[in-house]
Amino acid sequence: VTGKHRANEERPVPRPPRRGFSVGRVHRFSESLALSNAYADAEWWIPIYRQAFPKLMTAVSIREDGWAQRGGIDRVLTLQCGRTYTVDEKVRTENWPDILLEQWSDEERRIPGWIQKPLACDFIAYDYAPTETCYLLPVAPLQRAWRQRGREWIVAYGTRRARNPGYVSVGVPVPRDVLMQAIVDAMRLATNERRSIPMQLLPSPSQASLPF
């Protein structure tokens, strides 16, 4: 689900403290949490969620470090019927034509990134701040699409590394239209379909000598 929003011009949208600093590029948790909190009050979130869920009653931001934050939950949505959904909010400060899927949070220690580790959230809200556009990605089909197509995407689109003190994280930039179609395909289930091999078994791009 995608949504386009426009912030109220009378109240500026909160911006991160450092320009060019994107959610997901630096994976030290305290810094990522601080940046997430900088955007938590942005005026676009509620209109986006009301587009996706017209019967939305509340949208509670989760800011404290705890199991919910570390499980990928930034906001809890409650509908009139009592149904709740949990969302991981990611913001990119540049309008790149792709969605960057974090394969490894720490490449050397083989700590999986959010695309292949278990997440507690139902959706990932992937927002491009400059164009005021958000993609609401259902986590289960998204991760199944990765299991089905991840190898293909690594070869086709390469990887992007973020070098941080003591560790390197790795992401795969998948074009938005390609990822959207893969999610749709992942929603089709067949009992005779061959089971996908978990992406955790993949060698790192450097070990596999893949083009970057």
Show which residues each predicted segment covers.
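Acidic-basic catalytic patches of nuclease active cores, encompassing PD-(D/E)XK
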Residues: 3-4, 8-11, 17-69, 93, ...
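Intrinsically disordered, low-complexity regions of eukaryotic proteins
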Residues: 11-12, 76, 90, 104, ...
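Non-catalytic C-terminal interaction segments of nucleic acid-processing enzymes
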Residues: 19-33, 78-81, 130-212
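Catalytic cores of nucleic-acid endonucleases
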Residues: 28-33, 90-134
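Assembly/interface hotspot detector across virion components, adhesins/toxins, and nucleic-acid enzymes
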Residues: 56-57, 125, 156-161
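Short beta-strand or tight-loop elements
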Residues: 71-73, 120
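Conserved catalytic cores of phosphodiester-cleaving nucleases, focusing on short active-site segments
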Residues: 75-77, 81-95
